[in-house]
Structure formats: C-alpha cells, structure tokens
A protein has these predicted regions:
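Short beta-strand immediately N-terminal to the catalytic nucleophile in serine-hydrolase-like folds
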Residues: 155
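Short alpha-helical
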Residues: 53, 161-162
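Alpha-helical scaffold elements lining the catalytic groove of polysaccharide deacetylases
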Residues: 122-147, 151
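Short catalytic/ligand-binding loop motif for oxyanion handling, primarily in non-cytosolic enzymes
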Residues: 60-64, 123-124, 162-163
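Active-site acidic carboxylates
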Residues: 2-119, 146, 150-151, 172-179, ...
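Short Gly/Pro-enriched loop/turn and capping motifs at secondary-structure junctions
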Residues: 158-161, 184-187
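Gly/Ala-rich phosphate-binding loop of Rossmann-like dinucleotide-binding domains
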Residues: 167, 171
Length: 214
C-alpha cells in the first residue's frame, strides 16, 4: 500500500494559485460555478508557503480562443487551429479589464510572482508552464528551478483545465505535484472533470485537501 504524501510545505515547495480572476467567478464572462469559494481557503493556507506564484489569464482583444473571432461559431464549439483542437470561449480576461483582475478578496501579499499567460493572440494557454502549442514556455520552470523548488501545490480555477494542465506539465518537467482539491472548482464540460482527474492520477499527481496542509 502506497504511503500518503508528506503534505506540510517546506522550503522546496511552491504554491501555484491558478487564475482566481473575476471572469472565472460568479458574474464573470466565463464563470466557474462557485469559483469564488476557493478564495477564503487559499487565503487561509497560502501563508504556509514561502514560495507563492499567482497566474493570471491575460488575453488581448480578438484572441483566437474567443468564439467571437470565428464567425458562425458559438462559445464551447471546437475548432481546429494550427496547434490542434481548440475549445472556443466567451471573450474573457481581456487585458486591463475588470474581468481580468484578480478577485478582490484574494489576499496573498507575499506572492513573489504574478505570471500572465494567454497573451499571445494566436495561441491559448491553460498551463502555467507551457502554452497550448506545447512548445512556448512561460518561464515558470526556470523560475522555480532557480529557487530550488522540487514540488508544487496547485489550486484555483478551473480544475479540469488550467489547474490540471499546470499539474500535468509540472510532472512532465520533473516536479512533484499535488492538487488541493477543495481549493479548486471545475467547469466540467462533457465529463472533462473526471477525465482530468484520471489523467492526473496516471501522471502521478497527488490529490489532497486543504486540511492536509495545516
């Protein structure tokens, strides 16, 4: 029987808080159901980490992942782009907009890095490590390696997209990865949540609860 992971954060651990932004919370352009419920949890345990990274979806107007950029298409349709299949989204997290801002109640003042992703007009970005073309790096890998980070804890929005892609890429790049399940919320589109958890399990991503951190 496999032993439970050691979940108390140390100096070789980093917390990655993914896309806790207004457009992904109730009332936003691409709201994740109960997405704002992660905020008090993140605020409660983030202080346990010396190393904290916040990510922020940061799209230019007319981004290729927006349904409005594809005449005749509607949100949640899929199209084929140069790098593969792309879900089309409502316009969201447009650079400089209120929707792109981090949730007003998110309070992680000791976060050292806010990493903006999705700013290349023709490529979407779910993962905090790699753009959706699977070639363009965000620089997060090097940032963590320079600080001696060996393990990442991932939370935020949404479980089945940006959280999962971040955790999966962390594993591919050699980091241990844990997802804080109750500090995430999902879109869950056509079984995408169950599929994401299955992929993460196969990749060796650990699934924990916020209470395990304290």
């Amino acid at each position: 029987m496999a032993s439970a992971p050691q979940t108390k954060p140390g100096i070789r651990d980093a917390l990655i808080v993914v896309d806790v932004q207004n457009d992904f919370c109730p009332g936003g352009r691409l709201a994740v159901q109960k997405g704002d419920e992660v905020v008090p949890l993140v605020n409660a345990f983030a202080g346990r980490f010396e190393n904290v990274v916040l990510t922020q979806d940061w799209h230019p107007p007319g981004h290729r992942s927006f349904a409005t950029s594809h005449p005749g298409s509607k949100p949640f349709d899929s199209v084929r782009l140069a790098y593969g299949e792309q879900v089309l989204w409502p316009d969201h997290c447009v650079q400089g907009s209120d929707g792109a801002a981090l949730h007003k109640d998110l309070c992680v003042p000791h976060a050292q890095l806010v990493l903006r992703k999705g700013h290349h007009r023709d490529v979407d970005s779910y993962s905090a490590f790699l753009e959706a073309d699977r070639k363009t790096r965000t620089g997060l890998e090097g940032y963590l390696e320079e600080r001696g980070i060996k393990r990442v804890f991932v939370c935020g929005l949404a479980t089945d997209f940006c959280v999962a892609w971040t955790a999966l890429d962390a594993r591919k790049l050699g980091f241990a990865a844990l997802v804080v399940e109750d500090a995430c919320r999902a879109i869950d589109m056509q079984g995408s949540l169950a599929a994401a958890w299955e992929k993460m399990k196969k990749a060796g991503v650990e699934r924990i609860r916020s209470g395990d951190i304290f």
